[in-house]
Amino acid sequence: MSLFEDLINSKIRELEELKSNLLIDIETRIRKEATAVLNKYSTQITNIESEVALERERILYSAIIEARRKIVETYEQILNDFIETIYNEVDKLRGSERYVKFLRFLIESAINYTQTKDVIIYASPKDRGVVETLAKNLGITGFVIEKDIKGGVIVMTRDGSITVDYSLETLLSNKLEELKHLIYLETHER
């Protein structure tokens, strides 16, 4: 019986070894498949996280650009309102001694620059009478023509070789950067 038992025991050991190897093989396959699935989903999760981060950055960038655009629009509106206020103040001052002195100063400065009193002076229709009186008092031999300007004067030599633009629009335009800076300071001090 020993031979028979040895044979049976040998087969039992083979089956147990096969069973053990089969369990190890199945466990290895399951681990490989699980690792592959985890890697696949980890890659997908990483890609999704990257997409979310990019989308978040795009949304933030768009929001910053939109905020800056609105700030610029607001500053432009403030500047336009400020300039309109200046034009309205000039309209209120027209005919006052202060405004007449201002026009006289502009005309005298332009005459000094052109080095001649034989000039054409362009003025707002609202200022024409005052400018004609000032020109006469200053001994200017040219004439005054109405022009569509908000205030101030434009003085030109008769031959057109020299033009001095002291219109209110040009004076404000020359001060535009300073006005922007002042508005910026006023709005950021609060």
Curated annotation (Swiss-Prot):
Origin superkingdom: Archaea
Molecular function via GO: ATP binding; proton-transporting ATP synthase activity, rotational mechanism; proton-transporting ATPase activity, rotational mechanism
Topology in membrane: Peripheral membrane protein
Keywords of this entry: ATP synthesis, Cell membrane, Hydrogen ion transport, Ion transport, Membrane, Transport
Acyltransferase found in the keyword field: no
Pfam families: vATP-synt_E
GO BP field: proton motive force-driven plasma membrane ATP synthesis
InterPro entries xref list: ATPase_E_C, ATPase_V1_Esu
Cell location: Cell membrane
GO cellular component: a single term: plasma membrane
HAMAP family (alphabetical): ATP_synth_E_arch
Family statement drawn from the similarity comment of this UniProt entry: Belongs to the V-ATPase E subunit family.
Assembly description: Has multiple subunits with at least A(3), B(3), C, D, E, F, H, I and proteolipid K(x).
The protein's role, per its UniProt record: Component of the A-type ATP synthase that produces ATP from ADP in the presence of a proton gradient across the membrane.
The name this protein goes by in its record: A-type ATP synthase subunit E
Gene name as annotated: atpE
